[in-house]
């Protein structure tokens, strides 16, 4: 076994890399190594959730979010994204936040649309969260689900959400960036600017234990420590995207050309049966 929080040397390297890439000020004590992004999400939700809490996400979304949220006894509230570009409609977000809202889940690049949220959109979302925190006198957390962070095309930039909002928890996985989905390795990063972040980190540690994860795979923790900052060949995904997008749109299908990930979210030519 490794430490439940993850190998100390790996966590030091993670902190150093994230600080270098995103101008943060994290240490090893902000990182908790996990069994992939699904574990990162379930642990984070378990650490934050209390009875009657609500978490907001944005359609289209990874369907397991509902399972992960409801596992904690909380409710998932789904807000539709703007149909024309799948960016977030902040008016709808503001209307959806209530006194029961514990946090929101943002996934960028998005599964299944491949859309990357723009910096302008993120700033607007964070402004709404700040406003609602003051209105309700409570913390509202931003859970950043980022397994596709490196899978972007044409020099698209993915804003690092921790730099835009203090109460942020980042959930990351190496499944996509290193093409290692079956090896189950990732991490949680708790912002050092979050209110009572050490208590949040302690809750993350407790949630990981309560959910029975024990520790991330020890061998792959050693491997990841030597691969930080590397990716598999992203150009293959970009080539496939271009071929499929061109073919589908030539046949008359409508879809937004994805900025990242490896999905095309295609609108059917037929009307919805519902």
Regions found by a protein language model. Name each.
Residues 2-5, 9-12, 16-274:
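PLP-dependent class I/II
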